[in-house]
Amino acid sequence: MKRAIGFTLSLLLLSTIIAQPLQAVDKEPRKILSGWIPYYSVKTVLPLVRKLPSASPNVEGQPSVCDASQYGPVENQAIESSYLFTNKDLMKEVMPFWYSLKSPTVIRDNYVSGNPSWPIADTVCLMRRAGLQVIPTMTDGTAKLVLSEYLANPATRTTIVKTIVDLVMKNNFDGIDLDYEGFAFVDGNATWSKTAPRWVALIKELSVALHAKNKLLSVSTPYVYDPKEKQKGYFVYAWADIASSIDRLRIMTYDYSVARPGPMGPLAWTEKTIKYAISVMSPSKVYVGLPGYGRDWITSVQGKCPISAPPGLIGGAKAATFKMNYAAAKAAIDGAIPTFNEQYSEATYNYTQNYNGLTATGASTACTVNRTVWYQNARSYADRIALVAKYRLGGAAMWTLGMEEIAATNEIRTAALAIAPDPVVNTISLENVTDGFVNYGSLFTVKGLITLKDKTPIAGLNVTLEIKRPNETTWAKIADLVTAADGTVTTPMTLGGAASVRLTTGGTWERAASVSTEEEILVKSLLQVDRPVSALKTLPITIKAQLLPKLAGKTANLQKNVNGKWQNIGTSSISDANGVFTFITSEPKRGVVTMRIQVVDDIASPIFAIVIR
């Protein structure tokens, strides 16, 4: 009967999952999923596709272009059907697992060696095309205790900070994620009390440097418990001391059992470390770790295995790992029926392997290998995502994206819809902007209206005015605003060059983040003419014009009104590095001449007159 009930429940859950996309929902799912993308498995989440021969080439120091026009139909279909694009509604950021700190001035780029024919600029560009922030992870690539000693020296620590910030800025990443596990698993716990303050000093200094450039700081660490308790966890990471400096804490709530058979990350153990984390920092910073893999241990071996058997068949050998999306097939191959452990919220089973054959001396022999398997499945994920809802966490972090079974992804989406925030409608408008143009230096007004979907205005909401100039890929904040009682914001603005502007609001547990449409504004040039009021006939007359914005290499002509028509006089002038045109002319007769300066394919100056004496 238990088996029949379980089967019925599975059918009900499956029908719910299948029906979910058909339901009309007013809300978008809460973006609670993040995860790592190792350099060796980028193709798991993004296709390795080539751009068209006519595509814009990548230029050093310039952002890559990867919109649909850069690829053929087949390639675009592959992109849009990839893991990142089909699950982008659940994610706001990803952590490419690509970098390793080797010394204070050297960061090893594993992506390039792992993907030599797949430009990093194109990969990052496609992640941004999916609407994702890119916060790459950097591991500790130094030997035992080396990084701790680096951090003990303030000058060396500052050098490391500069090296990290330079990497972020060069690649225009949205921040950095530090995964320095050497402290925990290499250096030894006897060093933690000495290393902890050094780590804290690094985080505080790096935080200031990154935040000054509007970048994020994330850290990924093993579990930590309240230091007042007997069991403290990996206290070297000093969560309480770094809480105010970091933007994300991704807890590696997995690898509970490594050397010996057991659960990947028991539910109670996971919840305990979460409760400590949110006691020292905002829950919105905390992300629970989800393992996309399981382990298979050898528990014992009876008999002597033949030489034809796989090597390493001994009790206590290092466990084999497998992806969650292979777990069902593996269980079938192993001839086992997994059971779900309610206490740990994980799947497990035992199985045996029998090997018959010959010894090295040719004698007949046989052995039986007993094995135990543990892994998390869709139900495990549902239980852990429930902790996100219970404690209003920032979300979950998966090692690694794309390793989970489809049912697990569906559980995340179902949960994300159940806790979806109210959508916010963000509308931007511009005043004193004509057909997308403003005059150089002229004042115009940016207005916004922020409401709920039912048009109820949202008062007292923080709104950010952001700008993006041509050839830039990221938005920069230029003003902080607060909505009035009617949900509006208003601010004056001037521009010295073409740019796009938008309004954004941050998300809360109750309300979704919002982004207005992007308004492109082009700036009409301005010519400021420096010329004499009068001049003597036949003598040289010098006329200068300042082009604003200052552009070098533009061509302009000095023109004179002759019988109602504008005629070029003299030779054309090319603007110098400061955007200045210089003309030298003369007039043979006394009188009044009417002139202007015409920039080729652009504006003309105001008309001016010179009295010739």
Predicted regions, residues:
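Glycan-recognition patch characteristic of GH18 chitinases/ENGases
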Residues: 25-164
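Glycan-binding loop/region signatures in secreted carbohydrate-active enzymes
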Residues: 46-62, 292-387, 414-419
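Conserved, mostly hydrophobic/aromatic
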Residues: 94, 178, 206, 249, ...
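Substrate-binding surface in catalytic domains of secreted glycosidases
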Residues: 104-118, 184-332
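Beta-strand-rich domain onsets/edges
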Residues: 310-311, 421-454, 520-542, 547-550
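Glycine-centered loop-to-beta-strand initiation motif
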Residues: 448, 477-493, 575-584
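Short flexible loop/turn segments that cap and initiate beta-strands
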Residues: 452-477, 549-571
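Enriched for extracellular/lumenal, surface-exposed ectodomains of secreted and cell-surface proteins
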Residues: 495-517, 589-607
